[in-house]
Amino acid sequence: MKLSYFYVAADVPDGIIPESSVVIDVLRATTTIAWALENGADSVQVFADVDELKNQAKTFDSKEKILVGERGGKKLDGFDLGNSPLGVSSESVKGKRVFMSTTNGTRSLHRVRESKSLYTMALPNRKAIAERLKSDNPKEVWIVGSGWEGSYSLEDSLAAGALASLLMDQLESVQIVNDELMASIALWKNWENDVEGCLRIASHGQRLAGIGNHDDDFACCASLDNLSVIPKQIEMGVLRSN
């Protein structure tokens, strides 16, 4: 199994459709997706464009949908929830389609939407995704970070390294293809005993802290291997627990 890591959507090669892709946005989109599906959401549909989201959401009855979105870490006007994993409680999302647009994560999902198998991962469902990849046994996996407005993010690289490290421990066939992933593995080894600390010193972590109290979000996003949910794209842009 060949593993590659791309820091942001723009780094993903053109004209190639990978066998399997894993998109990461630790703070906070893929953590929120995991918790929404864990808490009973029917599905999560992701949009890079807010207007497109609103138009598509109009086709659903109000009781069958919930709008989740942020820009710059703040809830979008007219949306039901922002991008906090704590907000997507069972009471809020159970049985509903979550229409979601965020600053960074939804762009990365859009970039690799044609992958043969597309999953989202956060630290809480790292082990579940690793087990699924072992079961699928693809020849090549692209791990794609979300970054912040097109630039590198520490926390996504931490999670990429965490996934790769776990797969390397369990599979002899794993091959690390690029230096980006090798560096991410080293990052994980350095911070694996203080995951929340790494999230807090990251520039995006500092940005979140600067706009309000996100202590509970940090703790949630830093939790490791406590969810078994596997968000998988079942149709273009739509994720469901698989």
Curated annotation (Swiss-Prot):
Signal peptide: none annotated. It catalyses: (2R)-O-phospho-3-sulfolactate + H2O = (2R)-3-sulfolactate + phosphate. InterPro entries: ComB-like, ComB-like_sf. Its EC number is 3.1.3.71. Its cofactor is Mg(2+). Pfam families: 2-ph_phosp. GO terms for molecular function: 2-phosphosulfolactate phosphatase activity; magnesium ion binding; sulfopyruvate decarboxylase activity. It comes from the Bacteria. Transmembrane segments: none annotated. Keywords: Hydrolase, Magnesium. HAMAP family: ComB (MF_00490). Belongs to the ComB family. This is Probable 2-phosphosulfolactate phosphatase. It comes from Prochlorococcus marinus (strain NATL1A).
